Amino acid sequence: MAESYNICLDIGGTKVLGVVFNSKKEIVFRLKKKTKSGGDSSDNIEQLIISVVKELIEASGIKADKINAIAAGAPGVINQETGVVLFSPNLPWRNYNIKKPIEKEFGCPFYIGNDVNVGVLGEYKYGAAKGYKNVVGLFVGTGMGGGLILNGELFTGNKFKAAEYGHMILDPEGPLCNCGQRGCLEAFSSKQ
């Protein structure tokens, strides 16, 4: 059976990290590119993602038709089923379907979820939370987010906002957060 590959992306407010995995879950190649700060457009971020994936394919020496799927984690409220980023405080995405253009470009399935949900799911399946039925994760970076595993299942809530701890308002007169509110936990404790 011929070797096949998956590409995973961590799309953040300051960088896009891409990794190619083979069918044995071994890292074949990794790449990191900076995202521009400030008002970069949705189309520019989309083009950056496409260029990172193309560079990963070329630099790793694999053929594009050997890619099974591309998966990504990104900050914000994301409908995992449709691939629509409803809101991202650290990227210029509002009701933006990133799934369609990536699938069109590469001809393989593209999956996207909230970056912290994806991270907590990874810890649950392969890392520090392996073997636990219920897991709470809190990740701090450019922003701050949480993820929940309840009874062995990722819990996102009915509006994909479960565990958005970073946007709990601690002080209504506090510093302005990237989400537009004042006094969010994220505004006090993240790298934003």
Residue ranges and their predicted role:
Residues 3-5, 19-21, 29-32, 41-42, ...:
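Glycine/GP-enriched mid-protein hinge/lid loop-to-helix segment characteristic of carbohydrate kinases
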Residues 25, 73-74:
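A conserved beta-strand/loop capping segment in the N-terminal third of enzymes
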Residues 10-12, 69, 137-140:
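Short loop/turn motifs at secondary-structure junctions and domain boundaries
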Residues 17, 80-82, 146:
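Glycine/Thr-rich phosphate-binding loops of Rossmann-like dinucleotide-binding domains
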Residues 10-12, 22, 79, 115, ...:
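Acidic active-site catalytic centers that drive phospho-/nucleotidyl reactions
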